[in-house]
Curated annotation (Swiss-Prot):
UniProt similarity note: Belongs to the RuvC family.
Highest rank taxon of the organism: Bacteria
Subunit structure as annotated in this protein's UniProt entry: Homodimer which binds Holliday junction (HJ) DNA. The HJ becomes 2-fold symmetrical on binding to RuvC with unstacked arms; it has a different conformation from HJ DNA in complex with RuvA. In the full resolvosome a probable DNA-RuvA(4)-RuvB(12)-RuvC(2) complex forms which resolves the HJ.
Organism of provenance: Shewanella amazonensis (strain ATCC BAA-1098 / SB2B)
EC number: 3.1.21.10
Residues where Mg(2+) 2 binds: E67
Protein name: Crossover junction endodeoxyribonuclease RuvC
Record note on cofactor: Binds 2 Mg(2+) ion per subunit.
Amino acid sequence: MAIILGVDPGSRITGYGVIQCQGRHQLYLGSGCIRTSSDELPDRLKQIFDGLQEIIRQYQPSQFAIERVFMAKNADSALKLGQARGAAIVAATVAGLPVAEYSATQIKNAVVGTGRAQKAQVQHMVQQMLKLPAAPQADAADALAVAMCHYHTHQSLVALGGRASVRTYGRYR
């Protein structure tokens, strides 16, 4: 049984989603958003770090997965997003969690079946697959999709006789 924390990083809104996996079953445990309140980037990064530490304490995940950033609207946005990812990754490593990274295309493909899926399609599939009464908000749905992608990727590698740590995990130590 694994508890996976998925994170969709952002400097203003960071989505998180927690699922429990056993065999082929995925159970929704919780999700939401860390909304930063300060205009100062260092304060926002601390809010992300502190928020994720609290989520880690609450849910006690054994695995951590985060979306890998590959583009942004401009250089300043890319730098801020990278720093938000860094705050999230540090929160995971401080807790001793292995860190796995996935591209947006990998995540969408694992959950929707196509790497070009729209946000609404991701929300719908997350709702259906986790049997939720309503679609989660976009950032939380993306984070749940990250966790689900990690689970599917891990299961596929194990089924093929491989080790889940090969090519899947980015370890930060």
